[in-house]
């Protein structure tokens, strides 16, 4: 049986992650409070942030920026919107 969590992002009980997705205390908080579905949403948003802001992940400042955005996305006021991103019209 899959592990379930009360997902902080979705506001409902959902299937939890199999392991902490990030090292340290932040990774443990995410593992305990974030569902697989919400994590997949973050990965899509993170990809947009990297692409639209042309982040170089070899740069420690870019990685620190993404870590702050990840924490804000799940536990704060929300992550930054991807600069220049225009959602497709329906």
Swiss-Prot record:
Role this protein plays: Could be a mediator in iron transactions between iron acquisition and iron-requiring processes, such as synthesis and/or repair of Fe-S clusters in biosynthetic enzymes.
GO CC terms, sorted: cytosol
Pfam families hit by this protein: Iron_traffic (PF04362)
Family per similarity comment: Belongs to the Fe(2+)-trafficking protein family.
GO molecular function, one term: iron ion binding
Alphabetical GO biological process terms: cellular response to oxidative stress
Domain of life of the native organism: Bacteria
Coiled coil location: none
Entry keywords, A to Z: Iron
Keyword Amino-acid biosynthesis on entry: no
Protein name: Probable Fe(2+)-trafficking protein
């Amino acid at each position: 049986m899959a592990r379930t969590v009360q997902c902080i992002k979705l506001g409902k009980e959902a299937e939890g992650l199999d392991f902490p997705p990030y090292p340290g205390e932040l990774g443990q908080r995410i593992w305990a409070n974030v569902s697989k579905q919400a994590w997949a949403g973050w990965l899509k948003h993170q990809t947009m942030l990297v692409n639209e802001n042309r982040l170089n992940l070899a740069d420690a400042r870019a990685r620190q920026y993404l870590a702050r955005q990840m924490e804000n996305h799940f536990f704060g006021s929300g992550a930054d919107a991807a600069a220049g991103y225009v959602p497709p019209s329906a």
